[in-house]
């Protein structure tokens, strides 16, 4: 099959959150047996991207706020074709130093219009797979009866909380026809459109990234017109849980670790624990944490409202009260939250057991996965989550809120601990206390939790197989 993946993130070329990881992992796995091309907008931060082979270069026109010119360079990249599209006559839209900015709807709709024009001239694809609201306009553009692309369209919701509300006039500035434009419009306000709503109606199949998240989306009434769209498309909507690249995330070969190990040491638990403790000792020395404090609980996360920052703060208090170590590695574009955590960072700078690292450092994060005994993921919403899968592979027990993919992958008493009520700090604190007590007093139970996590199948092959089966069913 020829499969085209379209997204605005692709790790490691451009990454902000889990979207880039998910798109890259799926694309690379599918490319082992299929012809895969990834379309990505050009950002200044990837201007130095190079590849051993440029496959093609082309210029073309697209329609968005007038007739515009774009160019596309296709590279051979890790078994697939990576095509970077530059909006030459609207270059200012992607001139920012960050991936996301205030005019995201305009920027990404322009990219979608250019991608549609590119696909109309490219080798025909069997499947065009769109990732999240950013490229939602592309679903309607590809259905244009005057110049249709005869590919089956799959749309994946990675985060239902972000939907792409915009003016209908903006979308009409592309080549979308009136019929398909109507799918994007809100009935209650025809001057407003929603990129995700149109993508739901214009795609041949919709997926999201976990089974529980499907039900959470169906039960989300925050916008009744989006809810109606989900119900209308429910027969072609399912969840396929993400996986992780087990070659990239491998404690046996990870160069960021002070001491490497893997699941084969589960038969020698003393050796396994010693290796994790050696990583912890190196991390403690690096961050100036006293060796008197253990276990070590970590948070590795963006600091945004949906990730539960209030619970991150609560861990600090709990760690002080119960004399264990806590490390937070996180970034935030929310100035209010960032300032709150910077103030905490300053206040805790001399703490013997608490460290807040407010920038993302991949080698440090990897070492922390290995050194930590537990990782806490207190998200209000988490479509799938890769953090808990990575942590379990590194022998680190997840403490999570029972939501989305966290609920599907972390089973209390089997491979982790859970809480549910976001309005109940007592339940959250009880989970922390239970986990710390189990670590300190029940080593056999703790080993079983680690074993279940390390042996869990979290690779990409199962995810890719589900998608291949879906693609084939659409083509049959």
Swiss-Prot record:
It comes from Chlamydia pneumoniae. It holds the Pfam family Glycos_transf_1. SUPFAM superfamilies: UDP-Glycosyltransferase/glycogen phosphorylase. GO terms for biological process: glycogen biosynthetic process. NCBIfam families: glgA, PRK00654.2-3. HAMAP family: Glycogen_synth (MF_00484). This is Glycogen synthase. Pathway: Glycan biosynthesis; glycogen biosynthesis. The gene is glgA. The keyword Transcription does not apply.
């Amino acid at each position: 099959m020829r499969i085209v993946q379209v997204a605005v993130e692709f790790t490691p070329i451009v990454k902000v959150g889990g979207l880039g990881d998910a798109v890259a992992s799926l694309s690379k796995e599918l490319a082992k047996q299929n012809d895969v091309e990834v379309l990505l907008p050009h950002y200044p931060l990837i201007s130095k991207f190079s590849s051993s082979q440029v496959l093609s270069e082309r210029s073309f026109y697209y329609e968005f706020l007038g007739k515009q010119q774009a160019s596309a360079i296709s590279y051979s990249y890790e078994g697939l074709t990576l095509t970077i599209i530059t909006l030459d006559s609207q270059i200012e839209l992607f001139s920012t130093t960050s991936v996301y900015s205030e005019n995201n709807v305009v920027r990404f709709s322009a990219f979608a219009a250019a991608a549609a024009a590119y696909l109309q001239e490219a080798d025909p694809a069997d499947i065009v797979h769109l990732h999240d609201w950013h490229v939602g306009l592309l679903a309607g553009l590809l259905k244009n009866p005057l110049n249709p692309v005869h590919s089956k369209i799959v749309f994946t919701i990675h985060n239902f909380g972000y939907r792409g509300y915009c003016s209908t006039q903006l979308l009409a500035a592309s080549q979308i026809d009136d019929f398909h434009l109507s799918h994007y419009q809100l009935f209650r306000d025809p001057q407003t459109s929603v990129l995700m709503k149109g993508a739901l109606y214009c795609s041949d199949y919709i997926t999201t990234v976990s089974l529980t998240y499907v039900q959470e989306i169906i039960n989300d009434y925050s916008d009744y017109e989006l809810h109606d769209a989900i119900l209308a498309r429910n027969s072609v909507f399912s969840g396929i849980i993400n996986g992780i690249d087990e070659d990239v995330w491998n404690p046996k070969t990870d160069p960021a670790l002070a001491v490497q190990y893997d699941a084969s040491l589960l038969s020698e638990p003393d050796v396994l624990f010693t290796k994790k403790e050696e990583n912890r000792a190196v991390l403690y020395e690096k961050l100036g944490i006293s060796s008197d404090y253990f276990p070590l609980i970590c948070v590795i996360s963006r600091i945004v409202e949906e990730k539960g920052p209030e619970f991150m703060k609560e861990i600090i208090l709990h760690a002080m009260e119960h004399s264990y170590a806590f490390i937070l590695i996180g970034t935030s574009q929310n100035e209010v939250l960032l300032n709150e955590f910077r103030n905490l960072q300053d206040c805790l700078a001399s703490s013997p057991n608490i460290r807040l690292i407010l920038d993302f450092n991949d080698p440090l994060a990897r070492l922390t996965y290995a050194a930590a005994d537990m990782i806490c993921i207190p998200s209000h919403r988490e479509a799938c989550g890769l953090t808990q899968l990575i942590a379990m592979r590194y022998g680190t027990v997840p403490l999570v809120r029972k939501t989305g993919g966290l609920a599907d992958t972390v089973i209390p008493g089997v491979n982790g601990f859970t809480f549910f009520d976001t309005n109940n700090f007592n339940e959250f604190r009880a989970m922390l206390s239970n986990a710390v007590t189990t670590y300190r007093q029940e080593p056999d139970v703790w080993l079983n939790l680690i074993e279940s996590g390390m042996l869990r199948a979290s690779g990409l092959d199962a995810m890719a197989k589900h998608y291949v089966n879906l693609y084939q069913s659409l083509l049959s």
